[in-house]
C-alpha cells in the first residue's frame, strides 16, 4: 500500500501538472473582458481566453509564462487563441 502511494506521488511530480491546471476553463458570469490564459488538458497547452472577472477558478493566469511555469508546459511558438 505504501509502495503504491509513493509510486503515484512520484508519477504525479514527474509529469509536472499541478492539480489546478486540470480544472476546466471558467469564463465566469460577469461581463468584464480580461485577457487570461488557462491550461487546456486536451491540447496540453496554455491557451488564451477572455475572463469575465468573477467566479473563476485556479486555472486562470495573467500571463502565458505564468501558466506555463505553474502547469509545467514547455514554451511553444505562440498560444492557441480561443
UniProtKB/Swiss-Prot annotation:
Subcellular compartments: Secreted; Nematocyst
Primary location recorded for the protein, binned into one broad class: secreted
Keyword Signal appears in the UniProt entry: yes
Region forming the signal peptide: 1-16
GO cellular component, one term: extracellular region
Keywords associated with the record: Disulfide bond, Ion channel impairing toxin, Nematocyst, Potassium channel impairing toxin, Protease inhibitor, Secreted, Serine protease inhibitor, Signal, Toxin, Voltage-gated potassium channel impairing toxin
InterPro entries: Kunitz_BPTI, Kunitz_BPTI_sf, Prtase_inh_Kunz-CS, TFPI/VKTCI-like
Residue ranges annotated for the BPTI/Kunitz inhibitor domain, each copy included: 21-71
SMART domains (alphabetical): KU
Site feature location: Reactive bond for trypsin: 31-32
One GO MF term: toxin activity
SS bonds (residue pairs): 21-71, 30-54, 46-67
Pfam family, one: Kunitz_BPTI
Pro-peptide region(s): 76-82
Similarity remark: Belongs to the venom Kunitz-type family. Sea anemone type 2 potassium channel toxin subfamily.
Biological role: Dual-function toxin that inhibits both the serine protease trypsin (Kd=30 nM) and voltage-gated potassium channels Kv1.2/KCNA2 (IC(50)=2800 nM).
Name used for this protein in its record: U-actitoxin-Avd3h
Organism field: Anemonia viridis (Snakelocks anemone)
